[in-house]
From Swiss-Prot:
It comes from Cupriavidus necator (strain ATCC 17699 / DSM 428 / KCTC 22496 / NCIMB 10442 / H16 / Stanier 337). Pathway: Cofactor biosynthesis; pyrroloquinoline quinone biosynthesis. GO terms for biological process: pyrroloquinoline quinone biosynthetic process. The keyword Transport applies. This is Coenzyme PQQ synthesis protein B.
Length: 305
């Protein structure tokens, strides 16, 4: 049986964010709000054996692995369950964890689109840096709907679904989008036939993305911001949620309305920004999600597929 383990459920910076004193961050530090700290988003896919696919390598990966003993099978003096890494994009909070995995015993298999590999080869040259350590064995993911598998987890079929979003701020293509800058991931269990759709960064939901969401048994999607002006209103940033490539949860056409139209048995939000009021467990916003049957991911959450 395929299982999705949420290693990290927060957006970039984690929760609480190191330099933030918003209501949520200050409250969780002081213990004055009902909220649980979270690390930066990443998941692990496992099957019946000990091996796992790491999807996105968070800067918090070492802490996340310590909190997931099953990902250290201890079959040898140096060991890990991580058989390969799949990247959804080249964002800082999704790739810098690769540096923490540099002691891997051999070249680490890395699956990413050509656009992401291009950014990691030049603008943020992780592939060149890691060539002096374990090295990376890169595999370019197709963006045409062709399914692929990652050995030794051959019971899983994965498909990269191009999304309309933005390349990282450091990328020379930030304002010249390419297919594959950001993907969603269709995850299918060959034995059960069940599927999940994972997309921690969703800026716009067009017809083909909605079709993916609608066909999935489980959706694990972008819950970054509650409001489009969430960063602007308190003066944290001049950018809206849409400017940063995220569809806000509330409001007309927001993620709540999208999820309301889906038949999925579980609808789960991930990549939650530290400012998002849904992090407070007794907030009106969290209650609204519950009324719509929407869950909020947390570190250590296990999702059976």
């Amino acid at each position: 049986m395929t299982s999705i383990r949420v290693l990290g459920s927060a957006a970039g910076g984690g929760f609480p964010q190191w330099n933030c004193n918003c209501h949520n961050c200050d409250g969780v530090r002081r213990g004055t709000v009902r909220a649980t700290p979270r690390t930066q988003s990443s998941i692990a896919l496992t099957g019946d054996g000990p091996d796992a696919i790491l999807v996105n390598a968070s800067p918090d990966i070492l802490q996340q692995l310590r909190q997931a003993p099953a990902l250290q099978p201890a079959r040898a003096p140096r060991d890990t369950a991580i058989a390969a890494v799949v990247l959804m994009d080249a964002q800082i909070d999704h790739v810098t964890g690769l540096l923490m995995l540099r002691e891997h015993r051999e070249a680490l298999p890395l699956y990413a689109t050509a656009a992401v590999l291009d950014d990691l080869g030049a603008a943020f040259p992780l592939t060149r840096i890691l060539s002096h350590y374990c090295g990376l064995r890169t595999h370019a993911l197709p963006c045409d709907g062709t399914a692929f598998s990652v050995p030794p987890l051959d019971g899983l079929t994965l498909t990269a679904i191009p999304l309309e979003s933005k390349a990282p701020p450091y990328s020379p293509n930030r304002h010249a989008p390419r297919a594959g800058d950001n993907i969603g991931l269709r995850i299918e269990d060959r034995r059960s036939g069940r599927s999940a759709f994972y997309a921690p960064g969703l800026g716009r939901i067009d017809d083909h993305v909605f079709a993916e969401l609608h066909s999935a048994d489980i959706v694990l999607v972008d819950g970054t911001f509650w409001r489009d002006d969430e960063m602007q209103a308190p003066g944290f940033s001049g950018k809206s949620a849409a400017d940063m490539g995220h569809l806000a949860l509330s409001g007309p056409g927001g993620m709540i309305e999208v999820l309301e139209r889906l038949p999925a048995s579980r609808k789960i939000l991930i990549h939650i920004n530290n400012t998002n009021p849904v992090l407070v467990e007794d907030s009106p916003e969290r209650a609204e999600l519950a009324r719509h049957g929407i869950e909020v991911a947390y570190d250590g959450m296990e999702i059976a597929l």
